[in-house]
């Protein structure tokens, strides 16, 4: 017979894994969006925004996404459905917003506005995960707080860029 403690932990682990899988989809969507805009900004006079998009794409994939993949596996989840088929990314709670084009070029103002929406969604997701892992999974909770801080920093930088180009 299972103890109540192990049942609660298992239930919490299942919910944590599901939320982490959603966060992974959001991170992959974010990486894709940032890298596309970065490539289209290459050669423009906004090297600062191009550098932000390049660095943020790396954060989303190499730090956040990779950690989520490892942690989901460590907790007993699987990621094959997410990593093998980018079509599964569209099931994320916060959807990818594709870059907006204007006269054959990226509309940088609109792209920044869209990325602000994406970062706000990521912040919401990570706040939920931080709350969910608090007192249940200290290792995940610590890293999730760091990722949340990164997402809040990304949001502020995007808002600063938006203010600068208005």
Language-model features, listed with the residues they occupy:
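Proteolytic processing junctions in secreted/extracellular precursors
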Residues: 2-11
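A structural signal for alpha-helical segments
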Residues: 15, 44-55, 107, 139-146
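Acidic/histidine-rich alpha-helical segments that form the ligand environment
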Residues: 19-26, 30-33, 37, 66-71, ...
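Conserved alpha-helical segments that form or flank metal/cofactor-binding pockets of metalloenzymes
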Residues: 37-89, 158-162
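Structured surface interface patches that mediate subunit assembly and partner/cofactor docking
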Residues: 150, 164-166
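Vicinal oxygen chelate
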Residues: 153-157
């Amino acid at each position: 017979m299972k103890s109540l403690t192990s049942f609660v932990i298992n239930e919490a682990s299942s919910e944590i894994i599901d939320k982490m899988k959603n966060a992974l989809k959001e991170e992959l969507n974010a990486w894709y969006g940032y890298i596309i805009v970065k490539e289209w900004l290459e050669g423009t006079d906004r090297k600062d925004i191009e550098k932000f998009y390049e660095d943020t794409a790396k954060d989303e994939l190499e730090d956040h996404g990779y950690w989520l993949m490892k942690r989901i596996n460590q907790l007993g989840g699987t990621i094959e459905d997410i990593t093998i088929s980018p079509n599964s990314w569209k099931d994320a709670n916060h959807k990818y917003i594709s870059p907006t084009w204007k006269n054959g070029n990226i509309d940088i103002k609109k792209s920044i506005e869209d990325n602000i929406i994406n970062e706000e969604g990521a912040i919401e997701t990570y706040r939920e995960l931080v709350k969910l892992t608090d007192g249940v999974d200290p290792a995940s909770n610590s890293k999730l707080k760091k990722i949340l801080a990164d997402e809040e920093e990304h949001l502020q930088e995007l808002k600063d860029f938006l203010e600068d180009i208005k």
